[in-house]
Amino acid sequence: MASEPLALDIEKEPSGPLFLAIADAITRDIMRGRLKPGARLPGTRALARALGVHRNTVDAAYQELMTQGWLHAEPARGTFVAEDLPESMAEPVSVSVPREPATVRPHLAFSDGAPDPRLVPDKALARAFRRALLSPAFRGGADYGDARGTPVLRHALSSYLASDRGVVADPARLLITRGSQMALFLAARAAVKPGQAIAVEEPGYPLAWEAFRAAGASVRGIPVDAGGLSVAALEAAIESDPRIAAVYVTPHHQYPTTVTMGAARRLKLLDTVERHGITLIEDDYDHEYRFEGRPVLPLAARAPAGLPLIYVGSLSKLLSPGIRLGYAMAPEPLLTRMAAARAAIDRQGDAPLEAALADLIRDGDLGRHARKARRIYRARRDVLASALSAHLGGRIFFDRPAGGLALWLHCENVSADAWAERAGVAGLALLPGTHFALDRAAPQALRLGYAALDEGQIARAVDILARSLPD
Amino acid sequence: MASEPLALDIEKEPSGPLFLAIADAITRDIMRGRLKPGARLPGTRALARALGVHRNTVDAAYQELMTQGWLHAEPARGTFVAEDLPESMAEPVSVSVPREPATVRPHLAFSDGAPDPRLVPDKALARAFRRALLSPAFRGGADYGDARGTPVLRHALSSYLASDRGVVADPARLLITRGSQMALFLAARAAVKPGQAIAVEEPGYPLAWEAFRAAGASVRGIPVDAGGLSVAALEAAIESDPRIAAVYVTPHHQYPTTVTMGAARRLKLLDTVERHGITLIEDDYDHEYRFEGRPVLPLAARAPAGLPLIYVGSLSKLLSPGIRLGYAMAPEPLLTRMAAARAAIDRQGDAPLEAALADLIRDGDLGRHARKARRIYRARRDVLASALSAHLGGRIFFDRPAGGLALWLHCENVSADAWAERAGVAGLALLPGTHFALDRAAPQALRLGYAALDEGQIARAVDILARSLPD
């Protein structure tokens, strides 16, 4: 049972905390295969002596790796490399040592448009969560049981939507969910009978299609052009296919192309939906991230009263993908059906998280965070756009997105798949158009979700992008 | 816009904090209708002056009531009684002022078996949550995306189940869910095709039936006797109804009757399930709460390898209904199907909560809490059993439950519904047998979930119970 000696290759002058450099060295050894799943690590005392560091430093490194799932401890037996390594093993972006040693290839990823969790107002959130847990309301179990979510958050969200987006949302018509994914699933359950279809944008958001299919609906792609969903094509589809009972749109920043649906087309869409009596599902997933021009209000802010419109939003894009909080606004009886289905699959909301986020909204922390994040992401967008023009101008084209956390890169004369493959080998993960295709041919394009990369990472990523452009 | 003067009837010598006494007085005025929804409250300064207390005290009372959803603040306008009063309005158990003024009737409730959220190790939980939010793993977004849940919690849970229950659960076969409700929904989605049926205990757990129906399955009741689910009746049902594809059981403490399934019947159940090739869904919802005799290991601890058994558990019963964390263990490919459905309806788990609970398990806080809670609940059970015998002996009978958070009270010669109605008028909420009935006649019985009531509250509740016994 004696463990192997562990000769770690730790950076001599790590740019971050020493414990992270140790954690990073161990992670590298696991990735290289020098430390196998199940292998036992030396005790913290022994390793500290071997490395000439304080035992607490080694302990912090082990704790960090346990939190990340690389190691696990067995009481009275020791610390072992996890048998079941985290999914992120292939993408160790989480090891936050900014300078990589020469032996390890830089590993970067353009996401599908995730925010930067490093910006999360974590101290304010931790404080708010603590307040929520220690509050008499939580200890008294007061919020047990409303499938629509904690009243206090529905009230706070109602004010937020009214002041920020012109959406008048009666708290009684709001449903808090676990991220917008659940809101989309519940919307489809409430709006569509099994066997019916939902018209969706193509290219579009595959996770929404999964939610709709899980709810028993089929999905039918409607083409997207430079103005967003083609309402003429939608109209034709509805007339030819009586199964279409709803349409799903991302008018603010179309996913994945980032285009904004213009005012005239918005009115035409509302009119089409109303005439055909179908449900409109509006996903306003990153409303806060508008950098240019006047804010575009959601369809929900100007839809005629009585239109069956389900408005879906998320706080995950605003904070971190790890904060699971979405919401939906819908008229009765759609909301009642959604709440009933939510109770059946999830009983009730998450009282402490909901109370904590209500606090952040009420105290203004969320608004402050949104302003700060908007400033940072806007700068990152500009860095990305400049670097792309400088390195790839002429070979590719793109519109600098007016908002959102991603840029849509057209590359008509290049295979986006081949490009993504070559970039992957060079250490940069990319999402080509095939990722967003339903039935039609995939666009030769890449979605570059840049927000989680800092400016140095963006520069390196564009460098790899340029070097791996297929001939 | 001037607000009405507010003449509050505050207890002169409140037994709790003064701010809670003020909050309580305001709540009473709302409930009495003296303060209407939408009414404006005086400013904190004015009210503090009127009451002769410090302004912070009034502020704390308002904050408390906003957290509970009774009031809401509008920036620059003032504080108002919520238009949309919390569901708990009819049951202000959350207002934790122990001594009620004579004008207000004591309001108590026997639950369906919820734990006491006042016992939650909230400080340890707040600390663990803070650590999780501030950890590099969370800020790095490392845990994004595994639909089975955070690896570190699956590892911690695996050790916990092995040491505590003899259940050998490979972390790769564990799925973390939002409470056991979602685990039950996903179990039915994975095990049963739409149109097929799940055999369930009757009387039984209506929320499980809702989850199964939401997954497209019908439910078929199998009678329960003093030894739990009748396996002979199950066998007959399977033979007569080929739609039955799964059976749902609560063998440890049958819900709602609290009886434990004996060893011989357990073996017979496993044998029946195996011979007919149906899936076994075992809900071990309150394993930790065994007061008497040797611990009874779950079916999952002794099921033959390869049996399609889905084992479902929850940390909500151990901590608080407000902490939404359940889990399921299942063999491949059931687990893969469950994880895929979970991704479609909820994308991913709750990284901070999962990391925080992994911490509580690893540090031993969860085990310490379980031991403490077990001691307290056992004492409460004894107080309840003694009070029932003293006040109602001869009219009713019950077995002192060996475990669990509820007691099943038989009252064959009394209408349980009439009893519940009379007790309700006197201020005690009760759950009669009708609440747990599917197709068969409801048992004349009451489920007394006592765990959330302290000993004084139990005494008062039994007093009301005795006084409202129908003739």
Residue ranges of predicted features:
Chain A
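Active-site PLP attachment segment
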Residues: 76, 302-337
